[in-house]
Protein backbone atom coordinates (compact mmCIF):
# COMPACT_ATOMS: atom_id res chain seq x y z
CA UNK A 1 0.00 0.00 0.00
CA UNK A 2 1.27 3.48 -0.90
CA UNK A 3 1.02 6.29 1.66
CA UNK A 4 0.54 9.92 0.65
CA UNK A 5 1.02 12.53 3.37
CA UNK A 6 0.31 16.23 3.00
CA UNK A 7 1.68 18.55 5.67
CA UNK A 8 -0.09 21.58 7.08
CA UNK A 9 -1.63 23.09 10.18
CA UNK A 10 -5.19 22.31 11.20
CA UNK A 11 -7.87 24.98 11.39
CA UNK A 12 -9.69 27.38 9.07
CA UNK A 13 -7.25 30.22 9.71
CA UNK A 14 -4.45 28.20 8.10
CA UNK A 15 -6.31 27.32 4.88
CA UNK A 16 -4.53 28.51 1.73
CA UNK A 17 -1.42 29.54 3.64
CA UNK A 18 2.03 28.70 2.34
CA UNK A 19 2.62 26.21 5.16
CA UNK A 20 -0.52 24.27 4.18
CA UNK A 21 0.36 23.57 0.56
CA UNK A 22 0.73 19.84 1.34
CA UNK A 23 -2.88 19.74 2.57
CA UNK A 24 -3.98 21.59 -0.58
CA UNK A 25 -2.49 18.91 -2.84
CA UNK A 26 -4.10 16.09 -0.84
CA UNK A 27 -7.45 17.91 -0.91
CA UNK A 28 -7.14 18.38 -4.69
CA UNK A 29 -6.54 14.64 -5.25
CA UNK A 30 -9.36 13.63 -2.90
CA UNK A 31 -11.83 16.00 -4.56
CA UNK A 32 -10.79 14.89 -8.06
CA UNK A 33 -11.52 11.24 -7.20
CA UNK A 34 -14.55 11.86 -4.96
CA UNK A 35 -12.72 10.64 -1.84
CA UNK A 36 -12.74 12.19 1.62
CA UNK A 37 -10.69 11.91 4.79
CA UNK A 38 -13.43 10.00 6.59
CA UNK A 39 -11.43 8.35 9.37
CA UNK A 40 -9.42 9.59 12.35
CA UNK A 41 -6.87 7.69 14.39
CA UNK A 42 -3.47 8.40 15.95
CA UNK A 43 -3.83 12.19 15.56
CA UNK A 44 -4.43 11.94 11.81
CA UNK A 45 -7.34 12.33 9.41
CA UNK A 46 -7.07 9.66 6.73
CA UNK A 47 -8.73 7.44 4.20
CA UNK A 48 -7.77 4.26 2.38
CA UNK A 49 -8.89 4.19 -1.24
CA UNK A 50 -8.18 2.37 -4.46
CA UNK A 51 -6.56 4.47 -7.14
CA UNK A 52 -5.79 2.84 -10.50
CA UNK A 53 -6.15 -0.54 -8.79
CA UNK A 54 -3.66 0.26 -6.02
CA UNK A 55 -4.54 0.64 -2.35
CA UNK A 56 -3.52 4.09 -1.10
CA UNK A 57 -3.48 5.57 2.40
CA UNK A 58 -3.96 9.37 2.34
CA UNK A 59 -3.05 11.21 5.56
CA UNK A 60 -3.34 14.77 6.84
CA UNK A 61 -1.89 15.03 10.36
CA UNK A 62 -4.32 16.68 12.81
CA UNK A 63 -1.44 17.95 14.92
CA UNK A 64 0.28 21.24 14.42
CA UNK A 65 2.97 21.08 11.73
CA UNK A 66 5.88 20.53 14.14
CA UNK A 67 4.28 17.33 15.49
CA UNK A 68 3.33 15.71 12.15
CA UNK A 69 5.31 12.55 12.89
CA UNK A 70 2.97 11.78 15.81
CA UNK A 71 0.27 11.01 13.23
CA UNK A 72 2.32 9.63 10.35
CA UNK A 73 4.46 7.10 12.26
CA UNK A 74 1.63 5.35 14.13
CA UNK A 75 -0.68 5.24 11.08
CA UNK A 76 2.07 3.72 8.93
CA UNK A 77 2.78 1.15 11.66
CA UNK A 78 -0.91 0.32 12.11
CA UNK A 79 -1.41 -0.29 8.38
CA UNK A 80 2.00 -1.93 7.84
CA UNK A 81 3.13 0.64 5.26
CA UNK A 82 6.76 0.30 4.23
CA UNK A 83 8.82 3.49 4.27
CA UNK A 84 9.66 3.03 0.56
CA UNK A 85 5.92 3.39 -0.17
CA UNK A 86 5.68 6.80 1.54
CA UNK A 87 5.71 10.21 -0.12
CA UNK A 88 5.36 13.47 1.83
CA UNK A 89 4.27 16.82 0.32
CA UNK A 90 5.33 20.04 2.02
CA UNK A 91 6.25 23.69 1.53
CA UNK A 92 9.83 24.68 0.81
CA UNK A 93 11.22 28.19 1.31
CA UNK A 94 14.34 27.43 -0.74
CA UNK A 95 12.38 26.85 -3.94
CA UNK A 96 10.70 29.75 -5.70
CA UNK A 97 6.95 29.77 -6.17
CA UNK A 98 6.13 27.68 -9.19
CA UNK A 99 8.82 25.06 -8.61
CA UNK A 100 8.51 21.54 -7.27
CA UNK A 101 11.30 19.14 -6.48
CA UNK A 102 10.81 15.41 -6.01
CA UNK A 103 13.47 13.58 -4.02
CA UNK A 104 14.08 9.94 -3.11
CA UNK A 105 15.36 10.86 0.36
CA UNK A 106 17.06 13.64 2.26
CA UNK A 107 17.30 15.74 5.36
CA UNK A 108 14.51 17.86 6.81
CA UNK A 109 16.20 20.96 5.40
CA UNK A 110 15.04 23.01 8.38
CA UNK A 111 11.38 22.03 7.97
CA UNK A 112 10.00 21.14 11.41
CA UNK A 113 7.18 18.94 10.08
CA UNK A 114 9.74 16.85 8.22
CA UNK A 115 12.01 16.76 11.29
CA UNK A 116 9.12 15.26 13.26
CA UNK A 117 8.39 12.62 10.61
CA UNK A 118 12.06 11.67 10.33
CA UNK A 119 12.26 11.39 14.13
CA UNK A 120 9.16 9.16 14.37
CA UNK A 121 10.12 6.94 11.43
CA UNK A 122 13.77 6.74 12.47
CA UNK A 123 14.91 7.44 8.90
CA UNK A 124 15.04 10.12 6.22
CA UNK A 125 15.04 7.50 3.46
CA UNK A 126 11.58 8.28 2.08
CA UNK A 127 10.26 10.12 -0.94
CA UNK A 128 9.07 13.68 -0.82
CA UNK A 129 7.71 16.45 -2.99
CA UNK A 130 9.04 19.85 -1.98
CA UNK A 131 6.71 22.60 -3.16
CA UNK A 132 8.29 26.02 -3.58
CA UNK A 133 6.76 28.95 -1.73
CA UNK A 134 9.79 31.27 -1.97
CA UNK A 135 11.36 33.33 0.79
CA UNK A 136 9.89 36.40 2.44
CA UNK A 137 10.87 39.79 1.13
CA UNK A 138 10.46 43.20 2.76
CA UNK A 139 11.80 42.01 6.13
CA UNK A 140 8.86 39.75 7.03
CA UNK A 141 9.76 36.94 9.45
CA UNK A 142 9.70 33.36 8.16
CA UNK A 143 6.94 32.27 10.60
CA UNK A 144 4.72 35.18 9.55
CA UNK A 145 5.45 34.48 5.89
CA UNK A 146 4.61 30.76 5.89
CA UNK A 147 1.41 31.39 7.87
CA UNK A 148 0.30 34.11 5.44
CA UNK A 149 -2.34 33.29 2.82
CA UNK A 150 -1.33 33.35 -0.83
CA UNK A 151 -2.42 36.48 -2.69
CA UNK A 152 -4.88 36.15 -5.60
CA UNK A 153 -2.00 36.62 -8.03
CA UNK A 154 0.08 33.95 -6.29
CA UNK A 155 -2.87 31.55 -6.33
CA UNK A 156 -2.90 31.64 -10.15
CA UNK A 157 0.56 30.06 -10.07
CA UNK A 158 -0.08 27.89 -7.02
CA UNK A 159 -3.25 26.36 -8.52
CA UNK A 160 -1.07 25.07 -11.38
CA UNK A 161 1.54 23.86 -8.89
CA UNK A 162 -1.11 22.02 -6.85
CA UNK A 163 -2.43 20.29 -9.98
CA UNK A 164 1.09 19.42 -11.20
CA UNK A 165 2.01 18.05 -7.76
CA UNK A 166 -1.18 15.96 -7.73
CA UNK A 167 -0.23 14.48 -11.11
CA UNK A 168 3.21 13.65 -9.70
CA UNK A 169 1.56 11.84 -6.76
CA UNK A 170 -0.65 9.86 -9.14
CA UNK A 171 2.41 8.93 -11.21
CA UNK A 172 4.16 7.78 -8.00
CA UNK A 173 1.18 5.56 -7.20
CA UNK A 174 1.19 4.00 -10.68
CA UNK A 175 4.93 3.66 -11.26
CA UNK A 176 7.57 1.41 -9.79
CA UNK A 177 10.25 3.78 -11.16
CA UNK A 178 10.38 6.91 -9.02
CA UNK A 179 13.39 8.15 -10.99
CA UNK A 180 11.11 8.38 -14.06
CA UNK A 181 8.50 10.27 -12.04
CA UNK A 182 11.21 12.67 -10.84
CA UNK A 183 12.45 13.28 -14.38
CA UNK A 184 8.93 14.00 -15.59
CA UNK A 185 7.76 16.33 -12.79
CA UNK A 186 10.80 18.09 -11.30
CA UNK A 187 11.23 21.76 -12.07
CA UNK A 188 9.29 24.89 -12.91
CA UNK A 189 5.53 24.57 -13.37
CA UNK A 190 4.13 26.60 -16.26
From Swiss-Prot:
Site positions per UniProt: Stabilizes the basic form of H active site to accept a proton: 91
Keyword tRNA-binding: yes
Domain of life: Bacteria
The enzyme's E.C. designation: 3.1.1.29
One Gene Ontology term from the biological process aspect of the record: protein quality control for misfolded or incompletely synthesized proteins
Residues with site note (Discriminates between blocked and unblocked aminoacyl-tRNA): 9
One Pfam family in the UniProt entry: Pept_tRNA_hydro
Subunit structure: Monomer.
PANTHER family: PEPTIDYL-TRNA HYDROLASE
Name under which the protein is recorded: Peptidyl-tRNA hydrolase
